[in-house]
Every structure is written in structure tokens, then in C-alpha cells.
């Protein structure tokens, strides 16, 4: 009995365990239907256009990512290698290579133009000497801080692109006008002309060295001085003596140099001349033979005459633009003051007019002493005969007489000049002065 009961009890336990296993089993799930042979249903509704498709990673995308990372590593290694090589390379070699690259971009030859207007950081409008204007590019290696309207720039000869800036935009012709070395002539080399020397000292030299004298007197120093008189009376010589005596910058120009070929170059040179004078103040501007550009104005159909008149108008403008106490003085010289325009020599522009007449007996004696001081003269030489003569000899004629007498003595292998040499030299000088050069010189 006990065995049977125990047997029945064992079966009951097995049945309970089976029921637990059935309860633990998962529910039946239907298999995913196959899409093969079935059309994809089109998504309907407004939200379908904004939904992104589901993207699942693939092995091919992973390979592309690994390849891109490897390429990036190689590029970083190459960049590091180049940086190391640049660091090891001497600085001078790097600079030479950079200059060579810039020169290659610039090209040769380079044209010079004027910057008219800056459009933006990369474009500008430039003009050339011919007068045409161009809309051009500005190269990246050009210093943008130095660019300003009106400055001189370097242009490529093909596309006129701006490839550089001229730091010193001074006209080369104006730079040549500036005397780097003072002339050797002094006031002692000027025979006579004591009154003229005193007047030019008061008008030019003293305002530059002692301007306080004029302030105490309550007057304004003259702006400009004009020297006029017959040829050979010492106008240019006195201007050289002024340049030697003062420590001011001396700018010398001949009036014919202001007449240029292209339209507008003459007035531009006048502006450059006075701009350089103001930058190097105190300075003296000496314009010799001013009658080349300062003649009286009249109606003319010639383009050259109109350009000369424009140059003179720019000169008048520059004379009016000076400060009354400025450290720039204007010195002019001419042989024909009657042909000058009245607007040029009126008070306010040219305040003092100094006349240089033909030398008198006292001045002739002084000039002869200056030019014969180093010559060996014979005992029979009497210079008073030439001094008291009524011949209209200028200072340049007397100098030519002394030089010609010395040449005649050298022709005869003599180191002493005789009275006969002076007489022959006087005849030659007077003949060339009155009759001109002999025709035999041109045969």
C-alpha cells in the first residue's frame, strides 16, 4: 500500500513539472513575410516626404571609413615632413625661393601706374601714363596698408594687375633735381653785386636761418624772388652761392624740363617738385629760365601751347598754396622779364624782383681780379685798359676773355700770359658775341 501511494505521488510531481515548462514556453510569433515578388506600397500622406529612410551599416561603408582615416594619416605625415624640412632649411634660402615665386607672378617688365580708386580688397581702378583707366585685380602678396588713392603702383605688363607699391613715389626726374652735394661757388666768387647779394640774403637766406627776426618785426618774409637781367650777369652764379651758403635742400630745375610729352605730366612734375621741397624743408626751389613756361597767355589752338599754360597754372597754384612762414623759398631767373605773365610775378607770389645790370668799372675790376688771381701775368699786362673800355662786357664775357688768353698762351707753349693774348682774346669774344660763330666751324 505504501509503495503504491508513493508511486502515485511520484506521478503527480512529474505532471506539475510539465505544466511549469508549458507555461515558460514563448508565444507563437508569425514569421516575417517575404517581400519577394511584392510591390512596395507607396507611402501616403504629407509626413512621408520628411521622413528619412532607415540606414543600416554595411561592410562597404566601414571599409571606406578605414580607407579615409588611413589617407588622413598619410596626409598628416606628409605635412609634418614638409614642416620639418622647412624648419631645417636656412632662412635665406626660403626667402630667395619666396622672392623667386613672387617675381614669377609679377613678370617682367613691370609698368608703373597711378591708383585712382580702391573698389574692394581684391579690385581697384588704375591709370597709366597713356591716360587710360583699367579695372584690375590686386594680387594677394601686395601690402594693402600701403595702398591709397594717388599712390604709384607696379602693374603686370599683360593684365595690368597690381603687383606692388612704390614706397617712394617721387618722380625720378625730381630726384635728379635735388643737389646731393653743395656747389663750390661762394659769395666771394661773385664779383661786385653787393646790393644784389644783400637783397637775396634778406629774402631767401635770412628767413630760413633766423625766422624769429621777422616775427619780432611783425612782417612776413617774401615767398619768392626773381632774378632778371642780361645774359652772363651772374644770376645762376648767385643762386649757386646761396645753395652753398645755406644748409637747406636745394632743388634746381630748368623751365624747359617742365614741358613734357604726355598730357598732364608737366603739372604733375610741378606738384612732385614742391611736394619733395616740403618733405625736405627747409629747402630752396630754383627754377632757371622761367620764361620757358611762364610767358604771357594768349588764345592758341595748339595742344602744346595749352599744355604749357596748364603747367604755368599749376605753378601759380603751388605758389599760392605755400604757408606765409613756410620753410620753402622759390628762386627764379630769366633774361626776359617783360615776356612773363603778370600773374606770375605779381606781389604775393614773387615779392622781390632783383635786377642784374651789366657790370660797371668797379665790378669789372673785381671780376678781373677773381679770374686772374691764379694766372701768371706778364709785367706789361695792363687790365685797366679793358676795364675803362666802353665795351658792353658782362661777367661771363670777362671770364671767357681770361680763359681764351690762357689758351692762346698754351698754344705757344708759354706759361705766362701777355698783353697781346688779352687783346686777341677780347677780339674773339666780341666777334662771337656780335657776329655769332664763324661759318668755318660748320664746314
Curated annotation (Swiss-Prot):
Its main location: cytoplasm. Residues 1-53 are annotated as: Disordered. The keyword ATP-binding applies. The keyword Ribonucleoprotein does not apply. It is found in: Cytoplasm; Nucleus. ATP binds at residues 229-236. PROSITE patterns: AAA. It holds the Pfam family Prot_ATP_ID_OB_C. One of its GO terms (biological process) is proteasome-mediated ubiquitin-dependent protein catabolic process. InterPro entries: 26S_Proteasome_ATPase, AAA+_ATPase, AAA_lid_3, ATPase_AAA_core, ATPase_AAA_CS, NA-bd_OB-fold, P-loop_NTPase, Prot_ATP_ID_OB_2nd. Residues 12-29 have a biased composition (Basic and acidic residues). One of its GO terms (cellular component) is nucleus. Gene3D superfamilies: 1.10.8.60, Nucleic acid-binding proteins, P-loop containing nucleotide triphosphate hydrolases. Signal peptide: none annotated. The 26S proteasome is involved in the ATP-dependent degradation of ubiquitinated proteins. The regulatory (or ATPase) complex confers ATP dependency and substrate specificity to the 26S complex. May play a role in the degradation of microtubule severing protein mei-1. This is Probable 26S proteasome regulatory subunit 4. It comes from Caenorhabditis elegans.
Amino acid at each position: 500500500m505504501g509503495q503504491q501511494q508513493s508511486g502515485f505521488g511520484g506521478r503527480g510531481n512529474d505532471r506539475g513539472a510539465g505544466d511549469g515548462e508549458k507555461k515558460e514556453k514563448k508565444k507563437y510569433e508569425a514569421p516575417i513575410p517575404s517581400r519577394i515578388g511584392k510591390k512596395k506600397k507607396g507611402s501616403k500622406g504629407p509626413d512621408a516626404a520628411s521622413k528619412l529612410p532607415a540606414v543600416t551599416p554595411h561592410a562597404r561603408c566601414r571599409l571606406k571609413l578605414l580607407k579615409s582615416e588611413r589617407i588622413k594619416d598619410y596626409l598628416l605625415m606628409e605635412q609634418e615632413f614638409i614642416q620639418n624640412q622647412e624648419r631645417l632649411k636656412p632662412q635665406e634660402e626660403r626667402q630667395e625661393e619666396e622672392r623667386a615665386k613672387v617675381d614669377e607672378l609679377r613678370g617682367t617688365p613691370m609698368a608703373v601706374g597711378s591708383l585712382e580708386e580702391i573698389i574692394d580688397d581684391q579690385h581697384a581702378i588704375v591709370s597709366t601714363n597713356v591716360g587710360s583707366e583699367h579695372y584690375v585685380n590686386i594680387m594677394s602678396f601686395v601690402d594693402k596698408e600701403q595702398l591709397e588713392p594717388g599712390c604709384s603702383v607696379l602693374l603686370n605688363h599683360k593684365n595690368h594687375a597690381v603687383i606692388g607699391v612704390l614706397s617712394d613715389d617721387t618722380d625720378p626726374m625730381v630726384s635728379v633735381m635735388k643737389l646731393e652735394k653743395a656747389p663750390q661757388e661762394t659769395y666771394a666768387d661773385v664779383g661786385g653785386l653787393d646790393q644784389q647779394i644783400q637783397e637775396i640774403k634778406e629774402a631767401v637766406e635770412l628767413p630760413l636761418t633766423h625766422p624769429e627776426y621777422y616775427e619780432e618785426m611783425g612782417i612776413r618774409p617774401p615767398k619768392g624772388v626773381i632774378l632778371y637781367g642780361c645774359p652772363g650777369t651772374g644770376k645762376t652764379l648767385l643762386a649757386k652761392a646761396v645753395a652753398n651758403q645755406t644748409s637747406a635742400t636745394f632743388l634746381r630745375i630748368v623751365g624747359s624740363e617742365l614741358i613734357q610729352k604726355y598730357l598732364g605730366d608737366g603739372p604733375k612734375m610741378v606738384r612732385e617738385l614742391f611736394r619733395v621741397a616740403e618733405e625736405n624743408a627747409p629747402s630752396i626751389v630754383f627754377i632757371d629760365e622761367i620764361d620757358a613756361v611762364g610767358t604771357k597767355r594768349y588764345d592758341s589752338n595748339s595742344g602744346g601751347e595749352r599744355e604749357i599754360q596748364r603747367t604755368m597754372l599749376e605753378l601759380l597754384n603751388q605758389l599760392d598754396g605755400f604757408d606765409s612762414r613756410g620753410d620753402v623759398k622759390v628762386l627764379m631767373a630769366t633774361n626776359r622779364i617783360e615776356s612773363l605773365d603778370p600773374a606770375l610775378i605779381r606781389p604775393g607770389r614773387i615779392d622781390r624782383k632783383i635786377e642784374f645790370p651789366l657790370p660797371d668799372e668797379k665790378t669789372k675790376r673785381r671780376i678781373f681780379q677773381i679770374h686772374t688771381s691764379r694766372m701768371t701775368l706778364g709785367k706789361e699786362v695792363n687790365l685797366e685798359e679793358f676795364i675803362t673800355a666802353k665795351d658792353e662786357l658782362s661777367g661771363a664775357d670777362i671770364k671767357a676773355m681770361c680763359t681764351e688768353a690762357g689758351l692762346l698762351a698754351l698754344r705757344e707753349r708759354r706759361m705766362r700770359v701777355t698783353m697781346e693774348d688779352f687783346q686777341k682774346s677780347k677780339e674773339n669774344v666780341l666777334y662771337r658775341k656780335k657776329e655769332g660763330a664763324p661759318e668755318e666751324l660748320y664746314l
